[in-house]
Amino acid sequence: MSLLYLTFLFPLLGWLVLAFSLGRFGERTSALIGVGSIGLSALTTLWVGIDFLGNPPEGGVYVQRLWQWMAVGNFTPSFSLALDGLSLTMLGVVTGVGFFIHLFASWYMRGEEGYSRFFTYTNLFIASMLFLVLADDLLFVYLGWEGVGLCSYLLIGFYYKDRKNGAAALKAFVVTRVGDVFLAIGLFILYRELGTLNIHELLVRAPTLFAEGSPALSLACLMLLGGAVGKSAQLPLQTWLADAMAGPTPVSALIHAATMVTAGVYLIARTHGLFLLAPEILHLVGLVGAITLVLAGFAALVQTDIKRILAYSTMSQIGYMFLALGVGAWEGAIFHLMTHAFFKALLFLSAGAVIVACHHEQNIFKMGGLRKSLPLVYACFLVGGSALAALPLVTSGFYSKDAILWQVEASGQSALLWAGLVGAFLTSLYTFRLIFIAFHGKEQTKAHAGHGLAHHLPLLVLLVLSTGIGALITPPLAGVLPAGPGDHIEEGRHALEITSGIIAIAGIVLAAFLFLGERRLATSIANSAPGRLLSTLWFNAWGFDWLYDQLWVKPYLLATRLVGQDPLDWMMGLPAWFALRGNQLLAWTVTGKLRWYAASMGIGAVLVLALLLLG
């Protein structure tokens, strides 16, 4: 376990080497460094994990103190790494899934301008995420938090020559910064009240210093939730995620499966002891997840861009994790985080293969019949889509989503359970809508299948992990997180499993009925007046972008224009204005005509005499 620091040091070194090369390396060298550094990190994680599970440290936590960062009064943050079952699970997801995404990216990005720059950014992305999950102090968690935010901005705007991509990157950066401000305020409150930001010390001190429902702690947890919803794209800071599809497809896989959007879930799970003392805020976590998963499900139903459909599905699945956290199903949330990483990475990488095969076409209605020309990718979409839809017994997604739904039912919160079941139906419907439209029906474009180890291996490994085999990998969370409300109850569980399975299959059957064949019924529904209204509303993600534009963007721009007109500048400019106007008046009197001058002299003489007489 003493090699723990190498897990994030390898990606950090990869970033430094690629950054200082200034793009001089060729594609082969850049890929070797970029992919190799993540591979070494994954191997180190495997070694550390075997050692940790075989020789558990005392107390279940191994702390590696590297150095003290600063000492200002009582504020003495130490640069330390903490390894327990939760951070080990996150390490495995980030490095394991991240490695296969990098390997696939080495194929996907071939021939692209900025090949070396791409791996420079992704290595820093992985290093920042690893720093986030290993830090034993919320201050260092925040540094990693900001690191993944910066890297997401760089990667979403990777094709920066297109102004739309730059705007999407800026939008993601600004919206997530709103959440980051809330998180920073939460850290300030915690340090003021508890005198430390060390996670272990926080969880020990909070129960002794705060009563349940304490206003100060509730406010701190609310601020932490604000940071989590921003980074994990939950209501009301969810608007950036769909636009983040502007980046290369492997970036989407990294953000959605292995790194950024899972950070909010990790933060709440890591600080669970604080949220347990603020039950109203914990309930709000579940409510946010329930609303988000339903709204995102409807939005995904009408999208035409293959990546945006998957983006809204991520928003919905993260909603399930928040739902689990909100009812105290801590292990269920992390289990679903892990399985979701498997099948969502598979789906995004498969989508990338489809996009390349179809000459960078992303509209599913311009595809069709791809199952014949892309049999491997079709199989990956079937397995990954089935896991996303939680097809019973054979997929990893079924076991993790069922664990969440059971804990929600055991908690007695029926409204949240209904939201989860509605979301399950919508998920299977929009997932197989995508599959049936893109891979069945009439062929719309001539596709060419990808080839090579870097293309096939990641897809095949993730395909296997998306089946029920992936569910056999259980996160080592015993003793790290509290038991959920349904951990010791079995009565009624099988009935819920059957119900959720029927719902998933019903969604697939309805998708087949609507989108296989001529699709006349689906077309007639879409062209009806209610259909057009709802599809417009859902396509625009319930109008949140428009609403925020009216509430925040336009008033802000108006305020900048008003502030730009500085009254002091205006007053200081008055003498110059009068001088200019006087000069213009005098210039107007210069006509060059003798009669005008004589008349002017006469008028002037009369005015002088009048003044003398009046005086």
Sequence positions of predicted segments:
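Membrane-entry segments of alpha-helical transmembrane domains in multi-pass membrane proteins
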Residues: 1-9, 25-32, 75-93, 131-144, ...
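Transmembrane helix-loop-helix hairpins at membrane boundaries of multipass inner-membrane proteins
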Residues: 2-5, 21-120, 192-214, 239, ...
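N-terminal signal-anchor/start-transfer transmembrane helix
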Residues: 8-23, 99-100, 229, 293
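Hydrophobic alpha-helical membrane-insertion segments
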Residues: 36-54, 179-189, 382-389, 458-475, ...
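Hydrophobic alpha-helical membrane-embedded segments
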Residues: 46, 344, 425-432, 504-525
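Aromatic-capped, Gly/Pro-kinked transmembrane alpha-helices
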Residues: 74, 480-495, 517-615
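Hydrophobic transmembrane alpha-helices and their helix-loop junctions in integral membrane proteins
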Residues: 86, 96, 100-141, 150-451, ...
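Hard-cation-handling environments
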Residues: 448-510
